[in-house]
Amino acid sequence: MTQDKILILDFGSQVTQLIARRVREAHVYCELHSFDMPLDEIKAFNPKGIILSGGPNSVYESDYQADIGIFDLGIPVLGICYGMQFMAHHLGGEVTPGNQREFGYAQVKTIDSGLTRDIYDDAPNTLDVWMSHGDKVSKLPDGFAVIGDTPSCPIAMMENAEKQFYGIQFHPEVTHTKQGRALLNRFVLDICGAQPGWTMPNYIEEAVAKIREQVGSDEVILGLSGGVDSSVAAALIHRAIGDQLTCVFVDHGLLRLNEGKMVMDMFARNLGVKVIHVDAEGQFMAKLAGVTDPEKKRKIIGAEFIEVFDAEEKKLTNAKWLAQGTIYPDVIESAGAKTQKAHAIKSHHNVGGLPENMKLKLLEPLRDLFKDEVRELGVALGLPREMVYRHPFPGPGLGVRILGEVKKEYADLLRQADDIFIQELRNTTDENGTSWYDLTSQAFAVFLPVKSVGVMGDGRTYDYVVALRAVITSDFMTAHWAELPYSLLGRVSNRIINEVKGINRVVYDVSGKPPATIEWE
């Protein structure tokens, strides 16, 4: 299918993937490539426009230089943060270290231009933005004009209207920049003239064709967790190759309450997919005994999954592929997407936890999609709402929600506490009648392997602590902690302490992402 495309060159920002998400929200196809993508490949890609991402480095570092031939292609270019500095530096301007690092909220005063026209909210010629930079442009290249400034950054926005080159010293892709989406839409749709053709039905058509081409007549095994990602991956792959797909549902003893039965019933009823149920609790618990480091736990769980899949593969004559529900945020948190340029935060079970000697080839049909796109895809594939809009659940399961060593005792306590929390979220609504489960993007309980003193009845208790975590996010790259009603939190706490023997204290996590990640490990 021929469609207009935007190219994003990644200089290493942790939020570069959000640029791609915002472009796709405008229904325009885009791809993210490393900053050092060869010019001939850029020409072959034939983009309608180019976006240069932010990054943690200086324009004077020779290792982070794109081919400046991009400025001779006759297409619009938007430089974001480092991308703006790169543009200014290579087109004859000057970039110098700032007197002070600018990080966080700022207001940019603007003048009307092609980039800023009709994007304001309440205050004309004012943008509410998120800054994150040290260096700044101190002298404009020839042909450029200042179109925005802040008190500490006199050149916060610049443009060359004739060549359609634009630079902005803030991040329009993050939700903290209120008019960011409108600004990116202005660039992509109006300045670049890209026609919106990126939709989930189109994606299904292309993905199905790609899966069939990759797999051929081979059989595929998919690790089914019951979460959104693996469920949608199963539906998409099943749409492409039917009974060549066998889902392996591994009960590693780290699932949510009654999840095994629910997942088996759901897939038999809704998808008609072949599912093998493997009870491997003893195998996983034995390997995890005494292990406290979260990275080691992830890698052990990943390795044990592969052992299980290898055992099942021997029963399937043509099995050559291991399918996973890996999505964009998984990849960027492990190493910075396809470009491998962003600073690693932690390994993801679907990405960094697999052994090098894995016998099966990987099939990851969702790895270029964000979570909300995955949900859209699930609906387009005809999956039921309760499956598609279920909160995410990590591949390692409760193994990364039990801090430190994993024990069956801890998992049993956590399962009960988590189920109570989710029940109350589903049963409590806001003033508009929407459940707090639907209002939050992800919610769960975390087991803390420490004991605290309590009093129940006339006696002293010395039992474990659980933390409740609930966040609101549109993309899982950044997140706000959910401001749940005190009455709801109190009810959850009372039920857990009274109904789960072994827990006597409940706390609520009020950390955002960043600085914290959504999961505790």
UniProtKB/Swiss-Prot annotation:
Which residues does UniProt assign to the signal peptide?
none
Entry-linked InterPro entries: Class_I_gatase-like (IPR029062), GATASE (IPR017926), GMP_synth_C (IPR001674), GMP_synth_GATase (IPR004739), GMP_synthase (IPR022955), GMPS_ATP_PPase_dom (IPR025777), NAD/GMP_synthase (IPR022310), Rossmann-like_a/b/a_fold (IPR014729)
Which residues are ATP-binding?
225-231
**UniProt-listed Enzyme Commission number(s):** 6.3.5.2
Q: What does this protein do?
A: Catalyzes the synthesis of GMP from XMP.
UniProt protein name: GMP synthase [glutamine-hydrolyzing]
Per the record, its GO cellular-component terms are: cytosol
The enzyme's first-digit EC class, named in words, is ligase
Molecular-function GO terms, alphabetical: ATP binding; GMP synthase activity
Tell me which UniProt keywords the record has, alphabetically: ATP-binding, Glutamine amidotransferase, GMP biosynthesis, Ligase, Nucleotide-binding, Purine biosynthesis
What is this enzyme's catalytic activity, as reactions?
XMP + L-glutamine + ATP + H2O = GMP + L-glutamate + AMP + diphosphate + 2 H(+)
**Residues of the Glutamine amidotransferase type-1 domain:** 5-197
Quaternary structure and partners: Homodimer.
GMPS ATP-PPase domain spans which residues?
198-390
Q: What metabolic or biological pathway is this protein involved in?
A: Purine metabolism; GMP biosynthesis; GMP from XMP (L-Gln route): step 1/1
Q: Which residues form the active site?
A: 81, 171, 173
